[in-house]
Amino acid sequence: MDPRQACLDCLAQEPPALFEAALWIAAEHLPAYSPAHALRELDELVRQIGASLDDRASASERAQGLLRRMSEQGFCEDDDFPLQPRSALLPLVLQRRQGQPLSLALVAMELARRLDIPLVGVNFPGRFLLRVPQADHLLDPATGRRLYTPDCRELLLRLQGPKSELQAAYLKQASPGEILQRLSRNLRQLHSAAGEPLAALKDAQRVIELGPVGAADHEARAGLYRQLDCPQAERYDLERALLLSDDPTEQLRLGQRLGELAPPTSRALH
């Protein structure tokens, strides 16, 4: 089965099969790893963690307990520097029990789904978070720590700088498509930093295929096409980025990049 199509098919299910879709994203880069094998690994985790949770506790307490049990099982944030793509490829995250916060959150959300714990993802800037619907706090997927509004404001300042302001949009539930886009952006960045432009291009194309994107996503793909010496494809993405941008400074920069490209070639007619 084509991994990209399998991912899209999982996303189209009702409800979407988010974790399996993320496994198919990994399969584009790790053909030797079967999504079915990773799902069996998760079955064992469900048995181990589920047996230790208190069914009488509230949803918030069970969700936090789940994250703590994951930590006891060895799951933690990957502290490699620089980070490698393996921190966002779920089969390797399950194998190593280390990953980016989003990767850990995907494992937690699937465990929660199987254990009937309501747990959703939150596209917080700079760090993916979790929440139980209607709870008055968020949860850090790597530590299980509760984050109340002042904690979220402090985290945002640390991640985004002193001029950043907490917005309601930063705290809302992320859709499955948005989560897979964020995972794909993470992989695009990690593969690019690791000097793997072809792998990064797969991720860049998937970002655009999964849903609405902005100028930055087209510009990122244009940069990969430049590395791979594909000037016509680079031109297309720069033009799309210019069309989508509403920032005058960014528009000027994109226009300069377009001007550096050789003009499109056309066949002479005879």
UniProtKB/Swiss-Prot annotation:
It comes from the Bacteria. InterPro entries: SirB1_N. Belongs to the UPF0162 family. This is UPF0162 protein PA3419. It comes from Pseudomonas aeruginosa (strain ATCC 15692 / DSM 22644 / CIP 104116 / JCM 14847 / LMG 12228 / 1C / PRS 101 / PAO1).
